[in-house]
């Protein structure tokens, strides 16, 4: 259907700004998941990375159905071993999470321990921020533009690895002129 649409509308394949990845099923239902922005999604500030995370599948974070943990990381200090790049951390209440069951998925209450514990370690937040920073640079090179990116990610509870589920250009602030501070 997509190929037919592009052909009918004379859209060359190089104009399509989407990629598709086939990967293993990530077991974030027994890990955590969330979103990350390479610019502040509220202000457009482009020197920080904002990560939202919660336990279970990422659906509740993406839809706003849960108050996630929020971590802000300074891009300028990501490579500086003498400086902590984490600017701020706010723990979310994370009252519920979505997990797999026999018939699909179900929403469960999180444990008190999960509510009061960040859903990633500081090292994992910094690792994820580094990945987001590299993805942003790749997108900027690809589009020859200073765009930010919006990503969805998941931590597999079995192998303890972070996977990027989706990455796309950020659409609210990236179209505006970027201000240097």
Annotate the PLM regions.
Residues 1-181:
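Conserved mixed alpha/beta core segments that line enzyme active sites in large multi-domain catalysts
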């Amino acid at each position: 259907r997509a190929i037919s649409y592009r052909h009918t509308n004379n859209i060359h394949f190089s104009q399509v700004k989407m990629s598709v990845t086939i990967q293993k099923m990530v077991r974030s239902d027994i890990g955590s998941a969330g979103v990350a922005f390479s610019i502040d999604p509220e202000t457009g500030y482009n020197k920080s990375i904002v990560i939202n995370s919660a336990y279970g599948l990422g659906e509740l974070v993406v839809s706003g159905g849960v108050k996630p943990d929020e971590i802000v990381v300074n891009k300028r200090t990501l490579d500086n071993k003498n400086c902590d790049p984490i600017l701020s951390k706010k723990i979310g209440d994370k009252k519920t999470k979505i997990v797999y069951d026999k018939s699909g998925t179900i929403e469960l209450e999180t444990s008190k321990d999960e509510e009061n514990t960040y859903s990633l370690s500081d090292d994992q937040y910094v690792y994820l921020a580094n990945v987001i920073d590299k993805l942003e640079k790749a997108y900027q090179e690809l589009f020859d533009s200073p765009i930010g990116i919006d990503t969805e990610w998941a931590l597999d509870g079995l192998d303890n690895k972070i996977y990027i589920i989706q990455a796309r250009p950020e659409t609210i602030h990236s179209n505006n002129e970027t201000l240097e501070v």
